[in-house]
Amino acid sequence: MAAPKLGFFEKIANLTGALYRHQHAQFPRRFAILKAVGKHELAPPRQADWPAIKADWAKVQSFIQTGGYKNLSIREGLVYTAVTLEVVFWFFVGEMIGRRYIFGYLVPADYVSKSTKKTVKEQEALAALEN
């Protein structure tokens, strides 16, 4: 006798269960790898790393100053541009994460001192008189 045909949701449940069992078995190994990579990659540079960092930065500066970018192939230029944009975008993402707000810093209304508010009102009054 043939097995009954499974419905859509039964197929989804079976697939989800199989994925869960596979991921559950792999989790300890993957978590250990993630922890090791995170510990290595997120560590600040050591004292021994600074000479290499300075040498690489000097290479970048000389590359820009001598116009070495003019001799790049289109493919190399696109790769360098993509890497630069990735670094810049991750900087801005890090800024958003750090300030916990997407559009800018949340500044409370009482952050500006009373003397500064008074000076601004005086300047606005002078600007209104000039117009």
Curated annotation (Swiss-Prot):
Keywords: ATP synthesis, CF(0), Hydrogen ion transport, Ion transport, Membrane, Mitochondrion, Transport. It comes from the Eukaryota. Its main location: mitochondrion. InterPro entries: ATP_synth_F0_gsu_mt (IPR006808). One of its GO terms (molecular function) is proton transmembrane transporter activity. It is found in: Mitochondrion membrane. GO terms for biological process: proton motive force-driven ATP synthesis. One of its GO terms (cellular component) is proton-transporting ATP synthase complex. Mitochondrial membrane ATP synthase (F(1)F(0) ATP synthase or Complex V) produces ATP from ADP in the presence of a proton gradient across the membrane which is generated by electron transport complexes of the respiratory chain. F-type ATPases consist of two structural domains, F(1) - containing the extramembraneous catalytic core, and F(0) - containing the membrane proton channel, linked together by a central stalk and a peripheral stalk. During catalysis, ATP synthesis in the catalytic domain of F(1) is coupled via a rotary mechanism of the central stalk subunits to proton translocation. This is Probable ATP synthase subunit g 2, mitochondrial. It comes from Caenorhabditis elegans. The lineage of its organism: Eukaryota, Metazoa, Ecdysozoa, Nematoda, Chromadorea.
